[in-house]
Amino acid sequence: MKALVVYSSRTGNTRKIAEAIAAVLPGCEIHPVESAPAPEGYDLVAVGYWVDKGMPDAQAKAYLETVRDAKVALFGTLGAWPDSDHARDCIAQGEALVNAPERRNKVLGTYLCQGKVDPKIVAMMQKMASDVHPMTPERKARLEDAAKHPDEADCLRAQEAFKGFAEQVA
């Protein structure tokens, strides 16, 4: 199997997951999105992103829009709980980018895990706290927990998920 892992990472979270995934995919190339090759000619195209306002970040989104006629698996990191409604919405948004009918892709699955939030984004959220994202005790606790991720367990779960996605290609 010829696999391609492309990732966009702001804090290193998504890169860490990308490296874990690449380690279990035979015949795998791994590239940051800035230097990623065109997605054509691969049996599996895995694209990783950090969640920005409920969507894949701009660089990952631009790359995803180039993927056509491919078997695709997505992965991402976000500050929210990975089993939250927000996370499910983020997964749907990412898959919608790939599933546009004119692109003729097949999404094999998505893996999303929690990751530390860039301190600049946390500071920005605190400035606009009263408007959109108030810094409640729950939000503060979630951000503190997110700072511990991705951890080894997150990497192992990503590897297991992608072994399963790869089996769909073989």
Residue ranges and their predicted role:
Residues V24-H31, L44-V47, D52-A170:
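FMN-binding flavodoxin-like domain, especially the glycine-rich phosphate-binding loop
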Residues E40-Y42:
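Alpha-helix C-terminal capping/helix-to-coil transition sites in glycosyltransferase folds
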